[in-house]
């Protein structure tokens, strides 16, 4: 449990006095002494209480500190600091500040008045106001003269603040002093810079002035809560290091490839050629000289003065498309862009976009690749490169977009999401612990005060009874109830006690039928700090009733006076008649039918608002305004009557009612101010009524909840984002503002500031916001052009990386986390929703009753018995069973016992006892809260008996169920419905049941044909029942069996797949050139007939084989049937000559669906499609919700901009007339009549009605074409008036708001919903992957089990001396590292290449490259010599070998290869793959390896999705070819990018897959009449006339493609990457990963050179020391190795598995993980070594150590024994020498080693020296010379040697005379 706070109550606050300081000193001494005495048994070191950290709010449990204690030093509340010199100060807002109790600056003690005064000032809010006002001044682009004075004032205030901080805290010595807080470094720096810039002249002042901007960061230090978010951001940036490195590496490799492929290509332009003297500069197509190759030389040599370079560099001689700033690019390869007649393709001039877009050097190539990765304006680069290099290079972009853009960018998202998730879980865990403590505290209080204070349960009628729910209540729903935190009047969070709703007459909760007080778990997720942490409990001492009351006071949101006021004025209970009237009103207003009526009114009102358009007739306008009045009246009446029925006190306790009241009030205000100019904005508030639908629409409700909760939780993050945006906007303005003004002519032809500039704060803010949207490159070019490349790159990249990649991904991570788990359980406060369903239920019940009555009457009239229908009823009921709408599963938990549940279930009105509504049946399709059980499912299996009976009652003919018949699910696509579920279904899945998604694949194949027709058919037409055992029936049966055999044969299926592919391929040839290729056309027509015949035959065969029943119950067969029908109809029409009919033509375009038949045949695609179909209900739901959400913005757009986008243009120059010439439409018409050169036109994408508004919003949300819409809006004035430049500037804000809410939230919601849905499907399948086929799953598992390797037998060292030396050389790690360094150097030499390098540099680089090739060839040769045939057993070696051969071939044959293939330099790029090997050598690269591992694991699923995406692109491109092949070439459609041929279509669609440039391709298709296009234009080579588009088809085509590809399929890609990243993270998040085991094996191989799997025990210490972390056991390691208790085999050898397990155990400890690891390692080992040497351990290291110890003990004992004997003998010798020996005394030691040694020592020969050695003395010999007798096993014999030292120790020195010994 989390740390328990000290006892609550105000008694805790004590002044900090000298006595307190003395007490701290005393405690400090005591702890010091205790530490010196020695550590006690191990216990966790104490940690500071997180609730009492400096900067946090004081936990509510302490109550309100008395006023006299605020802002004064108090003793520290946190027990952790009791022995440290600190004190705390609590501010008025109850924020805790902690100070150091040492004298500040060695002068001011904590009790000095100066310091106390400083503390009081320090915590004042003045500083915040100063910072904000300073920020306002910084936003001024032209500050007034007096601003300098203000600047001094600010500097003064900041200096004063810093001084106060230093006085109150101390400067830097000791904790909690000024410089110990990193945030104060910021202050220190800002102040220092202010003084430095003031007194020292430092040149570039504007750059230094930008330092002042950092003051805005000071807001972070002042606002509580911001610091934590910033910490989280820094945390996620740390986590991103690996991704960043990988990204930079990948981009570098791609940039090198780009450099080699496209260097210099983007400078190829169309130059007017040949030069003709009489040719004017402005006649691009009028070339007078024949365009032949000799022209070049003729002109050059005939005109000596002609300057070729100047001519081609001159822009007048280059070909420009109208309206384009850059010359048209071209290329010289066959599929590159062509030049118009009279022009030649040459390399001239600078690169496009001011020269910044190119692949001419590594830096620019890297920038281009970064742009591709972030997908900003990448379609332009794509088109430019393809135009210059050729269409085949599309492949390069495909790889970069899929690997670079989709993978790396989403990896960043995955990392940020993971960092957020980890923090989130930590805070949730903490919250849970606090919750438990709080419950425990309440339990204690309750037990103490039970008798007097609290009743056990609230009585039903009491008005304010409170029930304290204890933690051990049986209710599973407990957590829901306890987790909500309420906000009090001051906006602080406090925990909530469960208020039981009073009964029917008095309850607010029940008035809104079930607006319960239980909180959603959702709030738990994000109320991180305050509410949850304040639930901390205390070690309850004896607490009085006062404490309980105080605690309850703390729980109540507002001061008591408010409650008195509310009870007096907001509860209207006066006289009896009023009460009766009120009850009557309540009865009517609360009736479900009224709710239904109100909902219908909301829908109608929304429709009325959406019907507004331009131009509108007066009658229509009048009708709309009357409608508005009526609806306003209805809603006002509803509010008024509800107020009467419920009393304001209860009415305003329900969120929806507050919402209603606000909208009604605004609507009434708007009616009053209808004619006031400029207040039309109020009309927009009516739109919020749409949100009332959320009451009855769970998904919308959920979306609003998610946005609400995210915005709540994002409060701080949003602030941080706002600060970042502000800082960068000011930085941009200060750094570049002046440059924009001074150098404006470089970027604008009129020398006026463009729309995007940084000259003032608002525009600077817009640029920063645009970068956050992901559009940075265009503004950066302009910035680089006016202010230089360096600073612009730095600033823009910082905004991009910090703002876009980190902060916005944190937003997204937060959104995704809102989906996790069941925190969005629909059905907590959906009482209103239930009313709606009750109403619908009543209606349907009425309808059913009427229907039954009619049927019964008819049957009676027909004379049938009445019994029959009644008998059939249950069957029908049964058939409905699988699709019944279930009770919301949450409600099954609400009542504790099953019986109550049954009763509730049966109540016809649907209202449960206690006023809690139970029927929670979601409305929208696919919304059920729990999944639908199939008929075979026994739902009740695991439930309690009582509950199961209840369930059965529900399953039976329950009247409720009849009532909800209307709402039943529509089965989706027959067999594929298994995946239906709500967007965020909260169903808790049981372990996988028999029914799974892949049901149809799993079923065993029938061996015989099934019945042809259903039983019902046979019943109605008896003739269909044929006897198959005889006659014709038998022949028919045999025919069916034959057909069945054919159809089931593998070859048949293969043949059909082949035909499908051929017929699909045939469609690709039907392009605009088909009429010119007669042969191809004839072949295709013939093939079409053949295909149709084959497919019809296949269909008939399947009908006969499977029967109609089986065929038509399979969704895939229906698809086949539909597509074959289309082919048949179009073929018949062709034969009858009707092919030119409109309907037949459109039917022919449907042939594009043919490839869909491939779906069911390719398992990979089918798997993905099944998963998608499962997600369709959710995706549709979110789509609908998005549409509703966008509807508001669309209607608002129509209100603001309808008819205002029209403008008058000059038809020759295509430019706008200024207002001075043309002010409005009539002026324009006058000019048109006079000159024919004016035209009153509208912007193609506009807001003239809601439909067009939606298209505009889609363009804004995808950030494509949005700038044009924005410009039109910002320039708009009034209807039929000519627009003026930025006259309506603040309309930008509409777009900013829509982008944040409409684009950001709703589009990212798609990702959330898709990921959530796939996770649900996975859970259904028992956590199997839903995007992979069985084969691919095997690959995936193999990837995961990469590490099941045993130590390999190392490559044997060659016996040859020279080979052996080479072998030793190349085996060293040094050699590997050396080669890696060379590869990196090689990469660097490739990087320094540029397009315009000098011949010397080129020559030098060529030589360097040759040198590298020589070195790498040498490496290869050395390895070949040393490794011999083993060289080819390693994949890397083969790779190196191939690269070397390619490099040599490339250098030798470079000219030949370049002529026919790609540039040979590309082979060198391949070598970069070897850098991958570095990753193995760098220990720190584990994170990067994880990321690559995640990619490897994602590959199979990504391949399937890629296939599906290609299929979709194929179908759409065929469709595009048949519809848009002839549209006018303008905007995004030109000679290369169009729908004329299949290749061009695919290129266009690939570009749109990322939503790139789709607005430009759509524009020409929106042309439908002259003068925009020409419907009578002849298209050469075909009979199709005109070049107009079809706007409706075009919009449908693009919107559907964008939704399918960009929003769904691409997001599936994201879902998979996130999923696999988590898996890879788990794998690598383990303490050990495969790499560690690999490292273990490699080290083992060095010690066990023979590959025996054993090493000597003596080697173990060195081996364990040689291992790398985390497995390493560093020396000295003897004891630890002995503790490991390793088994030893004969010869003191140890087996590798035992060592591996032991070192693994050291890392993991005794955990479950370790047990699993042990099993898996042993299993892998046994699997890999079936014939392994059986090793029987004879002892273990511990046993061996014990034996050694025992031997030592014996040795010591024997030594002591000898010692004593030695002393005896020495004394005897001494006595003998001095002659004091008794005659009868014998020598103690007559013989043996002791006697002999001592005799020698004392200079006298011992007697009997030659005697046999004593049996006590073991023979002295060293191991090898000892005889053959080995010691017995398990017995260690240690020879005891008697050394001279020992004897010397026991004998006295000769020169000392001893005194006489006393006897």
Curated annotation (Swiss-Prot):
GO cellular component: voltage-gated sodium channel complex
UniProt xrefs under InterPro entries: EF_hand_dom, Ion_trans_dom, Na_channel_asu, Na_chnl_inactivation_gate, Na_trans_assoc_dom, VGCC_Ca_Na, Volt_channel_dom_sf
Cytoplasmic side of membrane: 1-125, 169-182, 224-242, 415-592, 643-656, 697-712, 812-1051, 1102-1115, 1162-1178, 1312-1374, 1423-1434, 1483-1501, 1618-1863
IV repeat windows: 1355-1653
Ranges annotated as biased composition (Polar residues): 452-472
II repeat boundaries on the chain: 574-846
Compartment annotation: Cell membrane
UniProt-listed GO biological process terms: membrane depolarization during action potential; neuronal action potential
Membrane-spanning ranges: 126-140, 148-168, 183-200, 207-223, 243-262, 394-414, 593-611, 623-642, 657-676, 679-696, 713-731, 793-811, 1052-1069, 1083-1101, 1116-1134, 1143-1161, 1179-1198, 1290-1311, 1375-1392, 1404-1422, 1435-1452, 1466-1482, 1502-1519, 1595-1617
Disulfide-linked positions: 270-330, 339-345, 745-751, 783-792, 1208-1228, 1573-1588
Positions of the UniProt region annotated as Important for rapid channel inactivation: 1330-1332
III repeats: 1032-1346
Keyword Repressor attached: no
Biased composition (Acidic residues): 936-951, 995-1005
Domain IQ: residue ranges: 1747-1776
Entry keyword set: Cell membrane, Disulfide bond, Glycoprotein, Ion channel, Ion transport, Membrane, Repeat, Sodium, Sodium channel, Sodium transport, Transmembrane, Transmembrane helix, Transport, Voltage-gated channel
An example molecular function term from Gene Ontology annotations: voltage-gated sodium channel activity
Pfam families in the cross-refs: Ion_trans (PF00520), IQ_SCN5A_C (PF24609), Na_trans_assoc (PF06512)
Assembly notes: Voltage-gated sodium (Nav) channels consist of an ion-conducting alpha subunit which is functional on its own associated with regulatory beta subunits.
Biological role: Pore-forming subunit of a voltage-gated sodium (Nav) channel that directly mediates the depolarizing phase of action potentials in excitable membranes. Navs, also called VGSCs (voltage-gated sodium channels) or VDSCs (voltage-dependent sodium channels), operate by switching between closed and open conformations depending on the voltage difference across the membrane. In the open conformation they allow Na(+) ions to selectively pass through the pore, along their electrochemical gradient.
Domain remarks: The sequence contains 4 internal repeats, each with 5 hydrophobic segments (S1, S2, S3, S5, S6) and one positively charged segment (S4). Segments S4 are probably the voltage-sensors and are characterized by a series of positively charged amino acids at every third position.
Protein name per UniProt: Sodium channel protein type 4 subunit alpha A
Organism: Tetraodon nigroviridis (Spotted green pufferfish)
Gene designation: scn4aa
């Amino acid at each position: 449990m989390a740390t328990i706070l000290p006892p609550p109550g105000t008694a805790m606050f004590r002044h900090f006095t000298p006595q307190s300081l003395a007490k701290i000193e005393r405690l400090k001494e005591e702890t010091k002494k205790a530490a010196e005495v020695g550590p006690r048994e191990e216990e966790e070191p104490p940690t500071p209480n997180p609730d009492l950290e400096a900067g946090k709010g004081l936990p509510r449990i302490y109550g309100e500190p008395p006023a006299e204690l605020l802002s004064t030093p108090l003793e520290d509340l946190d027990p952790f600091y009791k022995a440290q010199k600190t004190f705390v100060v609590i501010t008025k807002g109850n924020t805790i500040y902690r100070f150091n109790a040492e004298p500040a600056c060695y002068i001011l003690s904590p009790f000095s008045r100066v310091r106390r005064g400083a503390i009081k000032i320090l915590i004042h809010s003045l500083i915040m106001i100063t910072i904000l006002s300073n920020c306002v001044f910084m936003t001024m682009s032209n500050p007034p003269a007096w601003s300098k004075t203000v600047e001094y004032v600010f500097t003064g205030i900041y200096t004063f603040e810093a001084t106060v901080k230093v006085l109150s805290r101390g400067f830097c010595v000791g904790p909690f002093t000024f410089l110990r807080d990193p945030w104060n470094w910021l202050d220190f720096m800002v102040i220092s810079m202010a003084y430095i810039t003031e007194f020292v002249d430092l040149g570039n002042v504007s750059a230094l002035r930008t330092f002042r901007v950092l003051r805005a960061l000071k807001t972070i230090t002042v606002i509580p809560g911001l610091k934590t978010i910033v910490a989280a951001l820094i945390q996620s940036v740390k986590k991103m290091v690996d991704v960043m490195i990988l990204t930079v590496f990948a981009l570098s490799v791609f940039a090198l490839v780009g450099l080699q492929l496209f260097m210099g290509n983007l400078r190829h332009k169309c130059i007017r050629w040949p030069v003709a003297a009489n040719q004017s500069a402005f006649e691009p197509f009028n070339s007078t000289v024949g365009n032949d190759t000799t022209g070049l030389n003729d002109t050059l040599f005939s005109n000596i003065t002609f300057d070729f370079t100047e001519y081609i560099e001159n822009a007048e001689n280059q070909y420009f498309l109208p309206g384009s700033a850059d010359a048209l690019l071209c290329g010289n390869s066959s599929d590159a862009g062509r030049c118009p007649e009279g022009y030649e393709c040459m390399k001239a001039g600078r690169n496009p976009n001011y020269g910044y877009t190119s692949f001419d050097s590594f830096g620019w190539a890297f920038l281009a690749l970064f742009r591709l990765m972030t997908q900003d304006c990448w379609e332009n680069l794509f088109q430019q490169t393809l135009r210059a290099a050729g269409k085949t290079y599309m492949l390069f972009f495909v790889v970069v977009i899929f690997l670079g853009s989709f993978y790396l960018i989403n990896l960043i998202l995955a990392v940020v999401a993971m960092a957020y998730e980890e923090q989130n879980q930590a805070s949730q865990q903490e919250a849970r612990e606090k919750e438990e403590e709080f419950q425990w505290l309440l339990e204690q209080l309750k037990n103490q005060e039970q008798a007097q204070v609290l009743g056990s349960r609230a009585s039903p009628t009491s008005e304010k009874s409170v029930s304290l729910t204890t933690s051990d209540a049986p209710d599973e729903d407990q957590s829901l109830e306890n987790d909500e935190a309420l906000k009090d009047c001051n906006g602080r969070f406090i925990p909530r006690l469960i208020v039981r709703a009073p009964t029917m007459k008095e309850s607010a909760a029940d008035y809104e039928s079930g607006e319960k007080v239980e909180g959603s778990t959702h709030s738990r997720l994000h109320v991180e700090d305050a509410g949850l942490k304040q639930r901390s409990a205390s070690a309850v001492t004896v607490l009085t009733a006062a404490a309980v009351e105080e605690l309850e006071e703390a729980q109540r949101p507002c001061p008591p006076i408010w409650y008195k006021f509310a009870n007096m004025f907001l509860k209207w209970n006066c006289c009896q008649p009023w009460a009766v009237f009120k009850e009557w009103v309540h009865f009517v207003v609360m009736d479900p039918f009224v709710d239904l009526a109100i909902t219908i009114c909301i829908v109608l009102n929304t429709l009325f608002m959406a019907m507004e358009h331009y131009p509108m007739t007066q009658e229509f306008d009048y009708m709309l305004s009357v409608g508005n009045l009526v609806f306003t009246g209805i809603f006002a009446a509803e509010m008024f009557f509800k107020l009467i029925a419920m009393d304001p006190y209860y009415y305003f306790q329900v969120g929806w009612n507050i919402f209603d009241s606000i909208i009604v009030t605004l609507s009434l205000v708007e009616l009053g101010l209808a004619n006031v100019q400029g207040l039309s904005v109020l009309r927009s508030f009516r739109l919020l009524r749409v949100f009332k639908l959320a009451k009855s629409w769970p998904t919308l409700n959920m979306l609003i909840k998610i946005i609400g909760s995210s915005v709540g939780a994002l409060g701080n993050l949003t602030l941080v984002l706002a600060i970042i945006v502000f800082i960068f906007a000011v930085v941009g303005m200060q750094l570049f503002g002046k440059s924009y003004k001074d150098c404006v002519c470089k970027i604008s032809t009129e020398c006026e500031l463009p729309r995007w500039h940084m000259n003032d704060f608002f525009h600077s803010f817009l640029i920063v916001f645009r970068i956050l949207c992901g559009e940075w490159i265009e503004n950066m070019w302009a910035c680089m052009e006016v202010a230089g490349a360096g600073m612009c790159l730095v600033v823009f990249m910082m905004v991009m990386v910090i703002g876009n990649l980190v902060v916005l991904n944190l937003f997204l991570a937060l959104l995704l986390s809102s989906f996790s788990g069941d925190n969005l359980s629909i059905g907590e406060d959906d009482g209103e929703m239930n009313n709606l369903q009750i109403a619908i239920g009543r209606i349907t019940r009425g309808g059913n009753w009427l229907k039954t009555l009619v049927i019964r009457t008819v049957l009676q009239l027909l004379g049938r018995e009445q019994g029959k229908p009644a008998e059939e009823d249950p069957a029908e009921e049964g058939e409905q069973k699988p699709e019944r709408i279930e009770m919301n599963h949450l409600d099954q938990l609400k009542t504790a016992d099953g019986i109550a549940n049954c009763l509730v279930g049966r109540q016809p009105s649907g209202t449960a006892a206690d006023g809690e509504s139970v029927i929670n049946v979601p409305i929208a399709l696919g919304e059920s809260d729990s999944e639908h059980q199939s008929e075979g499912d026994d739902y009740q299996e695991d439930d309690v008996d009582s509950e199961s009976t209840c369930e059965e009652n529900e399953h039976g003919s329950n009247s409720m169920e009849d009532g909800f018949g209307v709402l039943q699910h529509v089965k989706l696509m027959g067999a594929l419905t298994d995946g239906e579920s709500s967007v965020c279904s909260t169903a808790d899945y049981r372990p996988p049941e028999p029914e799974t998604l892949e049901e149809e694949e799993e079923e065993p194949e029938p061996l015989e044909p099934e019945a042809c027709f259903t039983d019902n058919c046979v019943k109605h037409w008896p003739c269909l029942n044929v006897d198959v055992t005889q006659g014709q029936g038998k022949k028919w049966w045999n025919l069916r069996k034959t057909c069945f055999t054919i159809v089931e044969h593998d070859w048949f299926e293969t043949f059909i797949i082949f035909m499908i592919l051929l017929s699909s391929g045939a469609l690709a040839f039907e392009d605009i050139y088909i009429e010119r290729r007669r042969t191809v056309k004839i072949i295709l027509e013939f093939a079409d007939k053949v295909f149709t015949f084959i497919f019809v035959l296949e269909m008939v065969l399947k009908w006969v084989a499977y029967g109609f029943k089986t065929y038509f119950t399979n969704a895939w067969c229906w698809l086949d049937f539909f597509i074959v029908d289309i082919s048949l109809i179009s073929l018949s029409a062709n034969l009858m000559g009707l092919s030119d009919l409109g309907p037949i033509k459109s039917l022919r375009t449907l042939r594009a669906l043919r490839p869909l038949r491939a779906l069911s045949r390719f398992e990979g695609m089918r798997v993905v499609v099944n998963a998608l179909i499962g997600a369709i209900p959710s995706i549709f739901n979110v789509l609908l919700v998005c549409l509703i959400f966008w509807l508001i913005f669309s209607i608002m757009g129509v209100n603001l901009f309808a008819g205002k986008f029209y403008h008058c243009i000059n038809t020759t120059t295509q430019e706008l007339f200024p207002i001075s010439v043309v002010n409005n439409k009539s002026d324009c018409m006058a000019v048109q009549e006079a000159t024919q050169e004016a035209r009153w036109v509208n912007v193609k994408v506009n807001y003239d009605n809601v439909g067009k508004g939606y298209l505009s919003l889609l363009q804004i949300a995808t950030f494509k074409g949005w700038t044009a819409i924005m410009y039109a809006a910002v320039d708009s004035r009034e209807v039929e008036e000519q627009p003026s430049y930025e006259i309506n500037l603040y309309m930008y804000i509409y777009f900013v708001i829509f982008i944040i809410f409409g684009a950001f939230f709703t589009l990212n919601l798609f990702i959330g919903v898709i990921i959530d849905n796939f996770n649900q499907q996975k859970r259904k399948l028992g956590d199997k992957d839903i995007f992979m086929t069985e084969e691919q799953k095997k690959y995936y598992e193999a990837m995961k089990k990469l590490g099941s390797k045993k130590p390999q037998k190392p490559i044997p060292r060659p016996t040859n001396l020279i080979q052996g030396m080479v072998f030793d050389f190349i085996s060293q790690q040094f050699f590997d590292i050396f080669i890696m360094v060379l590869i990196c150097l090689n990469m660097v030499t490739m990087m320094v290449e540029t397009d315009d390098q000098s011949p010397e540099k080129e020559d030098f680089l060529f030589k360097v490259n040759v040198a590298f090739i020589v070195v790498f060839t040498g490496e290869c040769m050395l390895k070949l010599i040393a490794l011999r045939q083993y060289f080819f057993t390693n994949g890397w070696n083969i790779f190196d070998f191939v690269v070397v051969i390619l490099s040599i071939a490339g250098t030798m044959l470079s000219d030949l290869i370049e002529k026919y293939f790609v540039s040979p330099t590309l082979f060198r790029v391949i070598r970069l793959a070897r850098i991958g090997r570095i990753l193995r050598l760098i220990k720190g690269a584990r994170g990067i390896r994880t990321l690559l591992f995640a990619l490897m694991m994602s590959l199979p699923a990504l391949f399937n999705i890629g296939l599906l995406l290609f299929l979709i692109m194929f179908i759409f491109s065929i469709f595009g070819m048949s519809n848009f092949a002839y549209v006018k070439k303008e905007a995004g459609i030109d000679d290369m990018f169009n729908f004329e041929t299949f290749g061009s279509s695919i290129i266009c669609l690939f570009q749109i897959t990322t939503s790139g440039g789709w607005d430009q391709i759509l524009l020409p298709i929106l042309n439908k009449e002259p003068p925009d296009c020409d419907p009578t234009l002849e298209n050469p080579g075909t009979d199709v006339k005109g070049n107009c588009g079809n706007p409706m088809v075009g919009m449908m085509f693009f919107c559907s493609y964008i939704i399918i590809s960009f929003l769904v399929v691409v997001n599936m890609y994201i879902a998979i990457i996130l999923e696999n990243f988590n898996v890879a993270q788990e794998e690598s998040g383990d303490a050990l990963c495969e790499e560690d085991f690999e490292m273990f094996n490699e080290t083992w191989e060095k010690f066990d050179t023979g590959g025996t799997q054993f090493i000597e025990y003596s080697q173990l210490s060195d081996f364990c020391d040689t291992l790398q972390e985390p497995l390493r056991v560093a020396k000295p390691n003897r004891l630890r190795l002995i503790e490991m208790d390793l088994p030893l085999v004969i010869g003191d050898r140890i087996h590798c598995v035992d060592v591996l397990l032991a070192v693994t155990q050291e890392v993991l400890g005794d955990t479950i993980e370790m047990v699993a690891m042990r099993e898996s390692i042993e299993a892998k080992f046994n699997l890999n070594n079936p014939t392994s040497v059986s090793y029987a351990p004879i002892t273990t290291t511990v046993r061996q150590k014990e034996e050694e110890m025992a031997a030592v003990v014996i040795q010591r004992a024997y030594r002591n024994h000898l010692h004593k004997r030695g002393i005896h003998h020495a004394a005897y010798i001494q006595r003998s020498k001095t002659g004091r020996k008794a005659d009868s005394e014998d020598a103690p030691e007559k013989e043996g080693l002791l006697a002999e040694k001592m005799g020698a020592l004392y200079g006298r020969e011992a007697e009997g020296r030659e005697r046999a050695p004593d049996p006590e003395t073991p023979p002295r010999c060293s191991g090898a010379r000892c005889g053959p007798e080995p010691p017995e096993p398990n017995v260690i014999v240690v020879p005891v040697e008697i050394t001279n030292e020992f004897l010397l120790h026991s004998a006295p020195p000769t020169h000392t005379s001893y005194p006489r010994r006393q006897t």
